[in-house]
Amino acid sequence: MENAYILGGLRSYVGVVNGMYRHIPAEVLGAEVLKQVMEKYQLREPDYIIAGNGVGAGGNIARLMALTAGVDISVPAFTVDVQCGSGLESIAVAAAKINSGEADVIIAG
């Protein structure tokens, strides 16, 4: 079994409903965070991108984020939706994939 480690993290600014982000699609906000994570930690293309989605916006927000951020189309990306626990659950799924040897580098949150 491989060990999984959390390298670090970033997030978007927190806004209010109908505030400064109201005209910016979620995938654009997420893509910016994704690009910054890859740059800050000098990550190569990850094996997976796993995004937590607590508001059920529909579709696969992780895939949209990855494509918007310019991540190679071959990198799988999927969304976990368990409401308030989605971010933590996406990290748990990432750890399980790394522990099993299925992946080496995953961006999750």
What are these regions (language model features)?
Residues 52-104:
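Conserved catalytic cysteine-centered active-site region
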Residues 1-75:
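Conserved "HGTGT" condensation-loop signature of ketosynthase/thiolase-family condensing enzymes
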Residues 3, 104-105:
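Residues that mark the start of a beta-strand
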Residues 8-9, 81, 106-109:
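Short beta-strand segments
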